[in-house]
Regions:
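A short linear-motif detector with a strong N-terminal bias
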Residues: 26, 54-57, 107-112, 128-130
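Short, hydrophobic beta-strand segments
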Residues: 130-137
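Short, polar/proline-rich extracytoplasmic segments that appear immediately after membrane translocation
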Residues: 12-55, 62, 67, 79-87, ...
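Bacterial N-terminal signal peptides
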Residues: 4-14
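Extracellular adhesion/glycan-binding regions together with long Ser/Thr-
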Residues: 101-125
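Short acidic/proline- and small/hydrophobic-mixed sequence motifs that coincide with surface turns
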Residues: 71-76
C-alpha cells in the first residue's frame, strides 16, 4: 500500500506539534576556547642584493611584516645560522635586526639561539622587524645564503 506524500507531511507535522507541545527543560551549554598562538609573515625571502666586502646594507628594503592571526598577542623572537657558499662562510652575527629602520651599526646582532626582540604583535595587528647585513672585509665572492627564523611566543 502506498502512502501519499500529503499523508507523510501531515504525520510529520503532527509529530512536531506533539513534541513542541511537550514539557521543556533548559540545557546549559559551555565551551572552552583554547589559546591559539599563530602568525604569518609578509615575506619569506630577504634579498640583500650584491654587496662589496666590508660594506653593509640599509634596513628599509629588508623588512619582514608579522601579522598575528591567533587569539593571543605574539612576542617575536629571532635566530639564524651562519652565511654559507660552497666551503666559504661568515658569521650569523653579521646579520642584524631592529624594530625600526636604523643604520646597520644600531641593530642587534642575530645569534644562533632564539633572542627576544621585544617586538610585540597584538591580536589581529601587524608589526615589523628590519634586517641588515654587514659583509666582512676580504670575504670570498659568491652567492651566500642564511636561514633566519621568526618565532612567535605567546
Amino acid at each position: 500500500m502506498a502512502i501519499s506524500s500529503a499523508i507523510i507531511g501531515w504525520m510529520i507535522g503532527s509529530m512536531m506539534l506533539v513534541m513542541a507541545g511537550g514539557n521543556t527543560s533548559p540545557v546549559t551549554a559551555s565551551v572552552t576556547i583554547n589559546n591559539y598562538c599563530a602568525f604569518t609573515v609578509s615575506n619569506t625571502a630577504i634579498n640583500f642584493g650584491a654587496l662589496n666586502p666590508g660594506s653593509n646594507t640599509i634596513y628599509s628594503s629588508n623588512v619582514i611584516t608579522v601579522t598575528d592571526s591567533g587569539n593571543l598577542g605574539s612576542n617575536i623572537l629571532t635566530s639564524g645560522n651562519s652565511w654559507t657558499f660552497a666551503s666559504n662562510t661568515f658569521g650569523v652575527t653579521n646579520t642584524v635586526w631592529s624594530s625600526a629602520n636604523v643604520l646597520y651599526g644600531s641593530g642587534t646582532a642575530l645569534t644562533g639561539t632564539s633572542a627576544d626582540t621585544a617586538i610585540v604583535v597584538t591580536t589581529s595587528a601587524t608589526n615589523s622587524i628590519y634586517f641588515g647585513l654587514g659583509v666582512p672585509a676580504g670575504q670570498a665572492p659568491g652567492t651566500y645564503s642564511q636561514t633566519i627564523e621568526i618565532i612567535s611566543s605567546c
